[in-house]
Amino acid sequence: MNMKRVLFLCLISFAAFSQTKPAAGSAAAAPVKPTRAAKYEVLYGSKPLSKADQKELNEFVASCDASFGSRAEAVAFFAERAWEYVATARLDTATQRFNLISALDPNSVDAFWGLGVISFQRGDNDLAIRLLNKGLELDSTQSMMRVDYAIVKLDCYQKGLECGTLDEVETELKHALAQDPKNANAWMKRSQVAYYKENYELAWTYFHEARVADILQLDLNFGALLEAKMPDPKGIFK
């Protein structure tokens, strides 16, 4: 789906992370969760629905069954709209749509993927990891979702949280690139992992792999940080 290509996870900048590893005791504080209506919470907050919400959900499912040739057709239609809401940062509306999709198909990969992305954007990395992992269990061929999963774990490492390590991130990125060798975003993140491991020559190798795959996805802020540690062996970036 084209809208997945503009996910905000893919736009995480490396510029804010000038250290090679998180400072001791620098773990980020847990985000304060705002109060939202149940329909705007991921999977309704995993709580029983109110009578009003359940009635609305039942009517939605019945309407889809009457209007579409199949549940799969309805899921595809609403997933496209939901990803558009993600792309325009309308996260509450996107959450509601993905919740509805989950009601149509409890095993919808789009629902778990989309809600995982939303959870990450809301600062709940643990929930994002659980949702994205479930999506990958349902369809392990989704290399772009695997990169999103790796990005969340990399964010955990960068924030000094226990939900991700560099080795875990590297494993997921290597897997994603085996599925799609031209995934520039995966090469960029792999370059960042090598940077954190202080293997700057390898970081440059991966950086140039990203350049060849899609120059528009290069993080030039990160490139400047890498260049400060070691000049570009190819002499392209100075």
Label each residue range with its predicted role.
Residues 1-22:
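Bacterial Sec-dependent N-terminal signal peptides
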Residues 19-88:
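N-terminal leader/linker segments that initiate helical-solenoid repeat arrays
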Residues 21-31, 37, 66, 73, ...:
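Terminal, low-structured helical/coil segments at or just beyond the last alpha-helical repeat
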Residues 48-58, 86-95, 123-126, 162-170:
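Helix-turn-helix repeat elements of alpha-solenoid scaffolds
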Residues 83-84, 109-185:
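Alpha-helical adaptor scaffolds
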Residues 95, 129, 163, 170, ...:
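Conserved positions within tetratricopeptide repeat
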